[in-house]
Swiss-Prot record:
It is found in: Cytoplasm. InterPro entries: Mur-like_cat_sf, Mur_ligase_C, Mur_ligase_C_dom_sf, Mur_ligase_cen, Mur_ligase_N, MurCDEF_pg_biosynth, UDP-N-AcMur_Ala_ligase_MurC. GO terms for cellular component: cytoplasm. It comes from Levilactobacillus brevis (strain ATCC 367 / BCRC 12310 / CIP 105137 / JCM 1170 / LMG 11437 / NCIMB 947 / NCTC 947). Pathway: Cell wall biogenesis; peptidoglycan biosynthesis. Its EC number is 6.3.2.8. This is UDP-N-acetylmuramate--L-alanine ligase. Belongs to the MurCDEF family. Gene3D superfamilies: Mur ligase, C-terminal domain, Mur-like, catalytic domain, NAD(P)-binding Rossmann-like Domain. ATP binds at residues 111-117. GO terms for biological process: cell division; cell wall organization; peptidoglycan biosynthetic process; regulation of cell shape. The keyword Electron transport does not apply.
Length: 443
């Protein structure tokens, strides 16, 4: 790390990039970055920190910079290209993260689903008991002075997490996703097993995942779940409209009764993983209980607001398994209300590869609406549309546009769940605006 340089982030509004920028800023380094001008949910944290965010322009690149390049951008990006031509140090995001975690007790959280929620929960709990730095995929990052722990989200896309060698790893699940890169479940498993062989102390893995049960590694693997064969087990789970309580056992030793104000079975499992890490780091269980009960969640993961007589939930879910978990959480908290799903499919390749599974998960809602497919920077077109998915949905499937969100006005005293990893929030904002105007008119 160099105090004389300015760290310039190409794509600073990316969720991981913004978190990394905040960490370096906290550590006292000079930080700036560039990105698209469109507003993103990560932007607020950068603005509050006073970090300069510029529009993309090769004129941003000059002597004295160390460039950290976001993984969405190729080496042909004008800023990255100019930096290389000038001989400036250029790191990819995951490479820089691999160097940054050295010198701490590091815990990487990997998995096709549940990474961000579990990373956020672990960061919150450990921060409450010891100095902790963290990087979360919701754009949150903190570089705490003299930190004992470094908690980070380990992204499997293009095997980027292999640039890190953590002390511990939590593996929430292995599932087929990112079909633009991975060829199938065996390819995904191969990436996770390679990561497992880089872990230094121990792995905490969900016991009901058949792929995770196959892991071959040089360090112990501790399984967590609800089965008698799991090393860390949740028993007597009670789910209510205020959250969940459960007893935790480790090899039949009772560790305590825990309470979380989170919803869905997946959050009980995420909490178990956090408890397991804390146990091996000899953290007091009473402190863990307090911190777990105090956690409110991470950005864009079951984020709620009330407007008129409606409950609006914003969630990052963009894979069938995530949609199922989010709708399960909504049912737990609002068992007597109608659940309406508004889903923005994310990337053409994922929509094609998982179409039947998307339809199956979405049909768990009482009514389903879709938006057009969100195309990523890596994939701008494809041979599929939301209409193809709509044909497989039995609970509706009408396609909404930002200019006309009025079909949602047919629902009253209900829950609308907006899901997607693209810009689904613009549909959410359009609906909220429509609802607000209607409320004012009626009053």
């Amino acid at each position: 790390m160099d105090n004389a340089t300015v760290y310039h982030f190409v794509g600073i509004k990316g969720s991981g990039m913004s978190a990394l920028a905040l960490i370096l800023h906290d550590k006292g380094f000079k930080v700036q970055g560039s990105d698209i001008t469109q507003y993103t949910f990560t932007q607020r944290g950068l603005e509050q920190a006073g970090i300069d965010v510029m529009a993309f322009d090769e004129a941003n690149i000059h002597e004295g910079l160390t460039v950290i390049a976001g993984n969405s951008f190729t080496d042909d990006h004008p800023e990255i290209k100019k930096a290389r031509e000038m001989g400036l140090p250029v790191y990819r995001y995951h490479e820089f993260l691999g160097h940054l975690i050295e010198g701490y007790t590091s815990i990487g959280v990997a998995g096709a689903h549940g990474k961000t929620s579990t990373t956020g929960l672990l960061a919150h709990v450990l921060s409450g008991v010891a100095p902790t730095s963290y990087l979360i995929g919701d754009g949150s990052g903190k570089g705490t002075p003299n930190a004992r722990f470094f908690v980070y989200e380990a992204d499997e896309y293009r095997r980027h997490f292999l640039a890190t060698k953590p002390d511990y790893a939590i593996m929430t699940n292995i599932d087929f996703d990112h079909p633009d890169y991975y060829t199938g479940i065996d390819d995904v498993y191969s990436a996770f097993e390679t990561l497992a062989k880089q872990v230094k102390k121990g792995i905490f893995a969900w016991g009901d995942d058949p792929e995770l049960r196959k892991l071959k590694t040089d360090v112990p693997v501790y399984y967590y779940g609800t089965s008698d064969r799991d090393d860390f087990q949740a028993r007597n789970i009670k789910r209510s409209t205020t959250g969940s309580t459960f007893d935790v056992y480790h090899d039949d030793e009772f560790l305590g009764n825990f309470e979380i104000h989170l919803f869905g079975e997946h959050n009980v499992l995420n909490s178990l993983a956090v408890i397991a890490v804390a146990y091996f780091e000899k953290v007091n269980m009473d402190e863990i209980k307090h911190e777990l009960a105090d956690f409110k969640g991470v950005k864009r993961r079951f984020t709620e607001r009330k407007l008129a007589d409606m409950t609006i939930i914003d969630d990052y879910a963009h894979h069938p398994s995530e949609i199922k978990a989010t709708l399960d959480a909504a049912r737990q908290k609002y068992p007597d209300k109608e659940i309406i799903a508004v889903f923005q499919p994310h990337t053409f390749s994922r929509t094609i590869a998982l179409m039947d599974d998307f339809a199956k998960s979405l049909n768990l809602a009482d009514k389903v609406f879709l938006t057009n497919i969100f195309s990523s920077a890596r994939e701008t077109q494809g041979a599929v549309s939301s209409k193809d998915l709509a044909q497989k949905i039995v609970k509706g499937g009408e396609i909404l546009t930002v200019d006309n969100m009025s079909p949602l006005l047919d629902f009253h005293d209900a829950v609308v769940v907006f899901m997607g990893a693209g810009d689904v929030q613009k549909y959410e904002r359009a609906y909220e605006e429509l609802l607000s105007h209607l409320s004012l008119k009626n009053n």
